[in-house]
């Protein structure tokens, strides 16, 4: 009898301690998930892309959605459309009435909605694994830090997570009415962020081609289990999602905007995130680690859902071609971490090591955000603010600048030579033969402009003090 009581006590104590440890782990992981993105959003100041969106939102509220010509630069006759018009209006209203911090907190809230949606998605992939799924979200947060800016891509991430939840739920339950949500996401996405809208369709492709042509191969290899579900409803949802995208202020022009932009060869030269990741860059390291995890997980589990293979493989290829596409690879990569691994089978030493790595990587993300803010963005902002202090009538002043400072100068009211919207200055987009030559001959222009700045320093100072009509600025 006494032995039974002792045994019950030991079992109860072990169960209680295990429960206590789970609670502590849950609290710590949730704290990291909440705190790290918040710190990054608050530390990072509004960047050049957001400044031009605020400027655009202010313009739309005053003048409407259809300017006759591009209104912010010194160039004439360039056609122009507001490709993120709804985000521009939303951002401007929040900034105008609630301030900069409120805009950051709003987008932080959108990102946390994405994190919550990802948690629900991971629960579909790995049930009864709360600690593991929370740890996976911490890893995802650390990798996503470089994309946490006050930009409309926060909405895109949220919509993609919701889309995958809908598709996964449909695969398991075969309830076709769930797919109605995806065309709605497509319609809202093209209003908020039309320049990346096709990613909604791309995420559907693995579910559309899950089996069809590969049934025999699947059965022969016995490593790719196939779920039986109807593909036709997904095809119909795909067609509907593409069709509703035309419902926007600029019609078909917004639908094909990304395709037209990618045909501009100068973009890769001018925008680093459009180029393929450098071999020794952080992005290349993340891609390599993701591939190693995939190969190791597949070798250990010996099977994978075919749609996961297509989704991860396709987005990995995208991330290899363009650095900014890596964020779209991280979402399926998180799903694969939940699919392949089981933390319950990992030793306590490995768990402790993993927890330490999570903490270090998370706080390193905050440090990187702080370093980037203090060494670059603030310098550009301060330089533009200095001009604004000395120029009482910026709307009558033309500034011959380089790209990065252009958007903030335009927000302040100056007319600029160039800004960060590289594609706008190409005749493939603006339908003007008089488009800005800077974005076609950038290296030559950089050299000549810097030479002019150095040789005419005294003349510029004299002109700045007396005329205040034309200003050269170079923050490189």
Language model region names:
Residues 416-460:
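Luminal/periplasmic acceptor-recognition loop/helix of membrane-associated glycosyltransferases
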């Amino acid at each position: 009898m006494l032995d039974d009581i002792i045994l019950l006590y030991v079992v109860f104590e072990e169960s209680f301690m295990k429960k206590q440890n789970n609670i502590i782990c849950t609290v710590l992981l949730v704290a990291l998930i909440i705190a790290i993105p918040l710190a990054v959003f608050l530390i990072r100041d509004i960047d050049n892309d957001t400044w031009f969106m605020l400027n655009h939102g202010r313009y739309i509220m005053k003048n409407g959605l259809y300017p006759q010509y591009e209104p912010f630069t010194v160039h004439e006759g360039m056609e122009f459309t507001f490709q993120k018009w709804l985000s521009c209006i939303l951002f401007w209203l929040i900034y105008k009435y609630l301030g900069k911090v409120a805009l950051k907190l709003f987008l932080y809230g959108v990102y946390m909605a994405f994190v919550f949606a990802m948690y629900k998605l991971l629960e579909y992939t790995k049930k009864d694994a709360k600690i593991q799924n929370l740890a996976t979200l911490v890893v995802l947060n650390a990798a996503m830090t470089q994309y946490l800016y006050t930009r409309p891509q926060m909405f895109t991430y949220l919509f993609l997570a919701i889309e995958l939840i809908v598709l996964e739920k449909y695969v398991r339950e075969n309830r076709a009415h769930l797919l109605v949500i995806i065309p709605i996401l497509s319609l809202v996405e093209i209003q908020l962020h039309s320049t990346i809208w096709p990613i909604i369709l791309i995420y559907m492709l693995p579910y559309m081609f899950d089996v069809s042509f590969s049934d025999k191969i699947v059965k022969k290899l016995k490593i790719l289990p196939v779920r039986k579900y109807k593909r036709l409803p997904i095809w119909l949802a795909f067609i509907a999602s593409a069709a509703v995208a035309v419902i926007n202020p600029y019609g078909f022009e917004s639908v094909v905007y990304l395709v037209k932009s990618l045909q501009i060869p100068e973009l890769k030269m001018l925008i680093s995130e459009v180029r393929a990741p450098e071999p020794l860059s952080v992005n290349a390291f993340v891609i390599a680690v993701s591939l190693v995890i995939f190969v190791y997980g597949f070798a250990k589990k010996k099977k994978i859902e075919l749609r996961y293979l297509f989704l991860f493989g396709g987005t990995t290829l995208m991330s290899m071609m363009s650095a900014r596409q890596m964020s779209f690879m991280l979402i399926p990569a998180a799903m694969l971490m939940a699919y392949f691994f089981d933390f319950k089978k990992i030793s306590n030493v490995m768990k402790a090591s993993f927890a330490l790595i999570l903490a270090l990587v998370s706080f390193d993300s905050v440090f990187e955000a702080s370093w980037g803010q203090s060494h670059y963005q603030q310098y550009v902002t301060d330089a533009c603010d200095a001009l604004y202090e000395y120029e009482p009538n910026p709307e009558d002043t033309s500034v011959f600048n380089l790209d990065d400072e252009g958007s903030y100068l335009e927000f302040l009211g100056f007319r600029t030579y160039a800004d960060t919207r590289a594609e706008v200055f190409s005749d493939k987009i603006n339908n003007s033969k008089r488009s800005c030559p800077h974005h076609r001959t950038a290296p030559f222009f950089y050299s000549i402009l810097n030479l002019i700045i150095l040789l005419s320093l005294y003349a510029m100072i004299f002109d700045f003090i007396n005329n205040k009509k034309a200003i050269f600025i170079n923050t490189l």
